[in-house]
Amino acid sequence: RFNAPSGVGRYTLAEGLESGAHKVELVKETYVGTNWTLHGFTLTGAGLLAAPDTASRHIEFYGDSNLAGYSLMSEQNESANRMVGCHYTYAGITARAFGADYHNVSVSGETLRGMKNLYDREDYFDTEPSWDFDRYTPDAVVMNLGANDIWGASENTIKQRYVDMLDLLRAAHPDAHIVVYNGWGWD
């Protein structure tokens, strides 16, 4: 695990390896407002093997810091973008357990009301362009929101926010299984 500094750079992932096949898994873990672009790989030796099959299952997650992985990499709950990592959150672990590809639309501190304004964005900071839901069709949609809504909202208000958000997700993903969970034990 490493944090790439600003600008363009080269990074040696491995050297001095024995002959044979080797696997490289690149996990890009960025948080809202941070962009990172992979420009390519340079290999020495025989070259690339055939790419593995793409996942046949697809899951889309909507959530708050629990799914975003905010401060996940810090035992002291340090709040820094370098401490973010959804690879080891419920979203990442669940997707790998099912052999699925996944999209994670999660933001630390997010509420049901706030996600209604974000779920269909291509860019967190811009309302346009809107995300084209035909670009990614999940088999399942998982929503873990609501924990941050408890501050200043009544139980009925929170329930209505769930209904509103579920209506939006159902319209966007008419054929997906939708799973809602939270850690607060609401009915």
Outline where the language-model segments fall.
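Conserved SGNH/GDSL esterase-like catalytic core that processes O-acyl groups on lipids
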Residues: V8, T30-W36, L72, Q76-K159, ...
